[in-house]
Amino acid sequence: LIFAFLIALFIRTFFFQPFYIPSSSMEESLLVGDRLFVTKFTYGYSKHSLPFSPNISDKRILFSSPERGDVIVFKTPEDNDTDYIKRLIGLPGDKIQMLNGVLNINNKPIKREFIKNDFVLCGGTKIKSNFYQETLPNGKTYLAAYSEKNSSKDTDVYLIPQNKFFFMGDNRDCSQDSRYLSSVGYVDKINLVGKAQILFFSNNEEIGNLFTFWKWHKSIRFNRILKFIK
């Protein structure tokens, strides 16, 4: 039993770690009730690769730079303990700004195409939103939701420091992310936990949970099981 525990701990620390999505900040890419695997080796290792993040070193070994557009789990700079999952938007040295409701990277608006008008979950309430397919400078595409009411208000320019990264949720007006400098802000490379890779299970908890087995045929999102994260 102890040997099995040590094997599981080794895999969790160095290879794959499961995570659960509790909020709607990344809808529609990630939904509340999604369960996914994060690869721990993609960006190398730091103290946050270990259980309970022991304060043993402020260095990162075998570091490999993340790519713009990656969906990443990281520890929030506010407490270096809480796990957040967001999309990487800004790299060290970048200038990031929301201007006229459009994401600008290094003084250029990104390409985007209107896809649909639909409802998106925000704090338990469904908000009417416009969905756009956004294309980052490296060609990475994803679907982002903008509330009809808020529409991501204009911001100052964020200048990303060295060894720091800027993250945003795909559900733009329902995401606590790097735009909020006092609570999230710029994320140090030490705080990166891993890259979100694949969904292994998904359950719509508005319909039922894992104990209400008679609702599984409706609550389990079978079309999301073993789906790669883009």
Please give the residue ranges for each predicted region.
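Soluble "head" domains of membrane/secretory-pathway proteins
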Residues: 28, 32-230
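Secondary-structure boundary/capping signal
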Residues: 18-19, 34
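N-terminal signal-anchor transmembrane helix
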Residues: 19-29
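Hydrophobic membrane-insertion alpha-helices, especially the h-region
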Residues: 1-14
